[in-house]
């Protein structure tokens, strides 16, 4: 599938992936211009695609980065208890610089609420993981491990959880691990 191709981790395909996402963004923007949207999942999807699109260059981050949060906020206007939107806006607050509103305190608040509002196993799984990783950074290891164990009970033998535990054993949260391996960080260091 296209999504599997986009998310296979092979950065050598970056140009093609960026083009696919860019074309999809144009279609979404055109659809939004011509239709009244009142669906929380639509806004989450638009925000997710925008986030993926901007993950290929610092220029795109600067251009699109601040457009993501309002999309998740719009989703939460339609469904204030949508765990998926809460988890993702929490990630936005985590990665955004303070100058544009980023805040670990807000991240924690959104992750806690996402966990409270999680209904499906998938929502619980990701809410547990993301909250655990913020707690890992705050050195709240007991609660972090408890949440990871809860995620493992939902999805035993998960390779994703194995990767997270491995990162944690190296002293890195999932967020720190992802930032460390991001090609964007390498690109931004070239600019500095």
Which positions does each model-derived feature cover?
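Amphipathic alpha-helical repeat scaffolds of TPR domains
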Residues: 1-9, 36-56, 81-97, 123-133, ...
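Short coil/turn linker motifs that delimit alpha-helical repeat modules in TPR/alpha-solenoid proteins
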Residues: 35, 57-64, 78, 100-103, ...
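TPR-repeat structural position
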Residues: 11-14, 65, 104, 141
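Alpha-helical junction/boundary sensor with strong preference for TPR arrays
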Residues: 25-28, 32-35, 72, 79, ...
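Boundary/linker segments of alpha-helical solenoid repeat arrays
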Residues: 28, 83-84, 115-124, 153-166
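Terminal, low-structured helical/coil segments at or just beyond the last alpha-helical repeat
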Residues: 126-130, 134-192
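Single-residue signature of alpha-solenoid repeat helices
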Residues: 17, 21-24, 68, 107, ...
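Outer-membrane beta-barrel transmembrane domain signature
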Residues: 95-115
């Amino acid at each position: 599938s296209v999504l599997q191709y986009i998310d296979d981790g092979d950065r050598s395909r970056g140009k093609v992936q960026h083009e696919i996402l860019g074309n999809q963004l144009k279609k979404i923007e055109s659809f939004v211009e011509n239709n009244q949207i009142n669906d929380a999942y639509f806004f989450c999807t638009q925000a997710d695609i925008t986030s993926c699109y901007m993950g290929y260059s610092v220029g795109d981050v600067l251009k699109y980065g601040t457009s993501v949060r309002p999309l998740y906020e719009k989703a939460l206007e339609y469904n204030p208890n949508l765990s998926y939107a809460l988890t993702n806006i929490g990630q936005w607050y985590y990665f955004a610089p303070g100058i544009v509103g980023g805040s670990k305190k807000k991240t924690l608040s959104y992750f806690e609420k996402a966990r409270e509002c999680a209904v499906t196993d998938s929502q619980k799984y990701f809410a547990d993981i993301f909250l655990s990783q913020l707690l890992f950074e705050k050195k709240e290891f007991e609660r972090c491990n408890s949440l990871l164990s809860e995620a493992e009970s939902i999805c035993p033998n998960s390779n994703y959880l194995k990767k997270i535990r491995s990162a944690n054993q190296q002293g890195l949260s999932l967020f720190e691990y992802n930032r460390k391996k991001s090609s964007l960080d390498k690109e931004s260091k070239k600019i500095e």
